[in-house]
């Protein structure tokens, strides 16, 4: 899988999340290592989510993981806290804000179950 294919798939998964109740401004950068290597960011602002294939220099947190790990996290098949504990996910920056990633994934999972 190429980075472009991986990014399109992950973007689709995260865009499914209804973040309208999250009013905080949060920015996460994701560094993909190994196959499909690349960088993208997720920004939450005013209840909207934006995902772009660029570096975000003023990020709250930075996550580094393999494509498989990030895909499983985005699908709700792997808990990001467990992934961090098992050293499958590296986190740098504001840990309190980084933990909000789980909130976004949980919101997406609830919406998927309602469909």
What does each model-found stretch correspond to?
Residues 1-115:
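Feature captures hydrophobic
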């Amino acid at each position: 899988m190429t980075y472009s294919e991986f990014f399109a798939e992950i973007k689709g998964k995260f865009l499914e999340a209804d973040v309208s109740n999250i009013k905080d401004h949060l920015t996460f950068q994701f560094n993909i290592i190994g196959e499909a290597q690349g960088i993208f960011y997720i920004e939450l602002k005013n209840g909207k989510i934006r995902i772009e294939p660029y570096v975000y220099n003023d990020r709250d947190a930075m996550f580094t993981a393999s494509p498989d790990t990030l895909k499983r996290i985005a699908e709700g098949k792997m808990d990001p806290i467990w992934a961090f504990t098992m050293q499958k996910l590296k986190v740098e920056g504001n840990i309190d804000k980084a933990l909000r990633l789980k909130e976004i994934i949980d919101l997406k999972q609830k919406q998927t179950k309602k469909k």
